[in-house]
Amino acid sequence: MSRKNQAPKREVLPDPLYNSKLVTRLINRVMLDGKRGTAASIVYGAFDQIKEATGNDALEVFETAMENIMPVLEVRARRVGGSNYQVPVEVRPERRTTLGLRWLVTIARNRGEHTMIDRLAKEIMDAANNTGAAVKKREDTHKMAEANRAFAHFRW
């Protein structure tokens, strides 16, 4: 791995429909094989379903879901004196968003509904209601951090 300068983070442009950078990042996360048009139609289709089902603004429901999914704490492996400890650390804001989106899309892909639009819409609505597998993933992560709280003094 190169020891030179870290590559600069590229700025994500807000999407044209909702004018939100978070939606653009969701589209990028859903995208497979560079097919952005397909990914965008999946995300916008899911947002349309959310609007029909809840009657609320889909962007607000999505943002609520993201708040419920994003972790505050996680554990990191730290080697001290020949043994590995799972040390709880706070998650930086950028990583919180990244993990939340990653968990949302991965779990939506593994759901049982027929189309990806259905799966994504249902998972977002579940997360907004504080249920669903993505929220459970966050709770499990927090539980791990809480269980390993004794090793918090190994933080670096």
Curated annotation (Swiss-Prot):
Annotated protein name in UniProt: Small ribosomal subunit protein uS7
Gene transcribed to yield this protein: rpsG
Task of the protein: One of the primary rRNA binding proteins, it binds directly to 16S rRNA where it nucleates assembly of the head domain of the 30S subunit. Is located at the subunit interface close to the decoding center, probably blocks exit of the E-site tRNA.
InterPro entries tied to this protein: Ribosomal_uS7, Ribosomal_uS7_bac/org-type, Ribosomal_uS7_CS, Ribosomal_uS7_dom, Ribosomal_uS7_dom_sf
Summary of subunit composition and partner proteins: Part of the 30S ribosomal subunit. Contacts proteins S9 and S11.
GO cellular component: small ribosomal subunit
Keywords, alphabetical: Ribonucleoprotein, Ribosomal protein, RNA-binding, rRNA-binding, tRNA-binding
Gene3D superfamilies: Ribosomal protein S7 domain (1.10.455.10)
Gene Ontology terms describing biological process: translation
Name of a matching Pfam family: Ribosomal_S7
Recorded GO MF terms: rRNA binding; structural constituent of ribosome; tRNA binding
CDD domains from the UniProt entry: uS7_Bacteria
Family designation: Belongs to the universal ribosomal protein uS7 family.
